[in-house]
Amino acid sequence: MGRLVAIAIGSTAVVALGVIALASRRPKSAPPKRVALIGDSYAVGLGPELAKLIPDFKYEGHVGTSTSAWANHTAACGQCGDWLTAFKPNTVLVSLGVNDGSAPSIANYQRIVQGLNGIGADVVWIEPPAAVNTQSRNTIASLGGLRGRVTGTRAPLSPDGLHPQQYGPWAREIAAAIST
């Protein structure tokens, strides 16, 4: 009988050690990501939807703004992301380019990326919806310094031919892309 008790106690100890070993192998949860979004009318539409999906999130968007406005800090872009330094985002989503016309300036894109990298943020550029014909897509594809790009949504466009009918599906695509 004493031997059975010893075996039972020994087995319990081994199982307990195994549980402790498994628990210590689990990855520690990363601190919540701070995510920001800056941009044009797409940011205006995406911001409220992404705020539902990302706990530590802030955004600024201004209809009709271009990379030139943001890169050169013009009045058109309001604060132009001045709040980003205090917010200290890990990742900044940039939704700009569709308003740049037929000859986007790579220098404006690079200035934005360098400025955001300079505050310690990874930059993920959000391309315009796939059905929107824009020269900015090639410029975005050629950028260095990005953590990544989110290709344009294939969601149906509104009658204006530029904006999605609904921003929720696009926001979910973006949130999934940056969580990997």
Question: Residue spans of the language-model regions?
Answer:
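Catalytic His-Asp segment of secreted/periplasmic serine-dependent ester chemistry enzymes
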Residues: 129-180
